[in-house]
């Protein structure tokens, strides 16, 4: 049987991304916040730093109430950096209104095992357009 090259780390990250995409699709700020560590640092689409569950929930609660937002994660790379730590990098393409051009960003997460579950402890997005 040929190996797909997929690892347990990839499965963990894929599971979190699936939950994240589902919660984003309904703009469920509580469900999104539940995916983050109590010690999370979060840089989203604005310049503010949000911290912990409350900060992440506040960020998502403040977003416009789009009817059917979607996100697609591509070019995902993972590294099991330590027994309880996973590093993630990829691309996230957000479509927030039907017919609109997607907002495509680079995304990095650091995922940590917290209380027996995997949680995002660091979230950062940045422009795919070169700044320099």
Predicted regions and their residues:
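A beta-strand edge to alpha-helix "cap/lid" segment located at domain peripheries
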Residues: 1-31, 41-132
């Amino acid at each position: 049987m040929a190996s797909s090259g997929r690892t347990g780390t990839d499965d963990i990250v894929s599971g979190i991304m699936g939950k994240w995409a589902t919660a984003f699709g309904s703009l469920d700020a509580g469900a999104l916040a539940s995916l983050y560590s109590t010690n999370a640092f979060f840089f989203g689409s604005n310049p503010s730093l949000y911290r912990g569950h409350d900060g992440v929930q506040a960020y998502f609660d403040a977003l416009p109430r789009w009817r059917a937002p979607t996100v697609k994660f591509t070019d995902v790379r993972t590294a099991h950096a330590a027994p309880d730590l996973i590093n993630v990098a990829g691309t996230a393409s957000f479509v927030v209104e039907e017919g609109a051009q997607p907002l495509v960003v680079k995304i990095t997460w650091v995922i940590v095992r917290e209380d027996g579950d995997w949680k995002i402890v660091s979230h950062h997005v940045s422009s795919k357009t070169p700044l320099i």
